[in-house]
């Protein structure tokens, strides 16, 4: 029998059937060894099904070897005893707070968005994601968590899976009233996560395989940025480029409004507009009301292989130089005397009408 460890369970049956996701079923260890025998006892079946952990089963068959499984159980038929290894859970770093001055919580309270972004040292930048759904989207996209802030009830509730997956991450918890004071608003979704800001990719990296991109020029409203990203993700935009005078997509409110879409669509900053796009073979379409603009449903636009849609603010619109340098100037036909839409609404219309129909 293999060497026992304190956190091990031991099976000493002569032969075992496999149990996969709680269902009895046969399995073979390799091409040369086939199972036979009786199933696990009911008690052992129940114990195994309750352990939603990464379990390692080591069965001494022939020379002895092992196989790892996740979230489901394989039990091998064998002719000698085996040990079931269940790794210990690391102790979670739960930190109760009773004061706004508690060390470590300043990233959720006193630091401004500019300080969190840390333009001087981008690798030290932080952003805040709110709600378990948005946090999980960020984690799934590869973003690194730094710390979690939540009400006590969420530790074993909505935030449990996040905490379990990152046992070394500090988790700050306090009363609903204290957390509302700390963050400046009531945590209706109950969970905030400070996450590491990655280095921004280059325009070439983001646009390498893209056919439809949007350029956001000077849009500073966080709600509009979040809404544009959500529409971009939903309607098939391959990448988002922003001029430096635009709002940071990882602003807390922008992330919240986007429902995590900022983590789903590649994005970066662009400084050479439209030169960098032309160098990569893109044609540009500036959204503006001019005498020579063409309607957004013009057949010519749908045939363009690589198209960059440039959008400005609702009030000031795009700079005249940007419009003059664009390959096309495009407008959305409107009725009842309305001459413009909110930039987020206009973006949704443009993304749908100018979507890639060839891919």
Language-model segment annotations:
Residues 286-338:
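Active-site/ligand-binding-proximal alpha/beta "capping" segment
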Residues 131, 220-228, 341-346:
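Amphipathic alpha-helical repeat scaffolds
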Residues 3, 7-9, 29, 33, ...:
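Short, positively charged and aromatic/hydrophobic N-terminal segments
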Residues 87, 92-152, 247:
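Boundary-proximal intrinsically disordered activation/regulatory segments immediately upstream
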Residues 193, 231-235, 244-263, 320-359:
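Structured adenosyl-cofactor binding patch, chiefly the S-adenosyl-L-methionine
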């Amino acid at each position: 029998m293999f060497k026992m460890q304190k956190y091990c369970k031991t099976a000493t049956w002569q032969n075992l059937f496999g149990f996969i996701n709680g269902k009895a079923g046969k399995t073979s260890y390799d091409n040369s060894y086939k199972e036979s025998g009786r199933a696990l006892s009911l008690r052992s079946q129940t114990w195994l099904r309750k352990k939603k952990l990464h379990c390692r089963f080591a069965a001494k068959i022939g020379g002895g070897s092992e196989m790892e499984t996740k979230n489901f159980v394989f039990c091998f038929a064998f002719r000698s005893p085996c040990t079931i290894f269940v790794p210990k859970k690391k102790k979670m770093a739960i930190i109760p707070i009773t004061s706004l001055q508690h060390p470590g919580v300043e990233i959720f309270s006193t630091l401004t968005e500019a300080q969190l972004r840390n333009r001087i040292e981008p690798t030290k930048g932080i952003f805040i994601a709110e709600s378990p759904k948005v946090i999980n989207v960020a984690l799934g996209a590869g973003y690194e968590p730094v710390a979690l802030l939540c009400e006590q009830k969420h530790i074993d509730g909505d935030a449990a899976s996040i905490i379990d997956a990152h046992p070394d991450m500090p988790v700050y918890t306090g009363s609903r009233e204290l957390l509302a004071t700390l963050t400046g608003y009531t945590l209706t979704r109950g969970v905030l996560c400070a996450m590491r800001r990655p280095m921004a990719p280059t325009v070439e990296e983001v646009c390498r395989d893209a056919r439809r991109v949007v350029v956001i020029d000077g849009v500073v409203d966080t709600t509009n940025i979040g809404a544009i990203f959500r529409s971009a993700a939903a309607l098939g935009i391959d990448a988002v480029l922003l001029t430096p005078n635009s709002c940071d997509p990882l602003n807390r409110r922008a992330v919240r409004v986007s429902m995590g879409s900022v983590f789903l669509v590649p994005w970066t900053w662009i400084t050479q507009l439209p030169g960098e796009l032309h160098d990569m073979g893109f044609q540009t379409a500036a959204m503006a009301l001019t005498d020579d603009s063409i309607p957004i449903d013009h057949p010519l636009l749908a045939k363009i292989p690589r198209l960059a849609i440039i959008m400005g603010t609702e009030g000031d619109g795009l700079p005249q130089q940007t419009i003059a340098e664009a390959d096309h100037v495009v407008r959305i036909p409107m009725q009842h005397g309305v001459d413009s839409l909110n930039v987020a609404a206009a973006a949704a219309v443009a993304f749908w009408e100018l979507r890639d129909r060839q891919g």
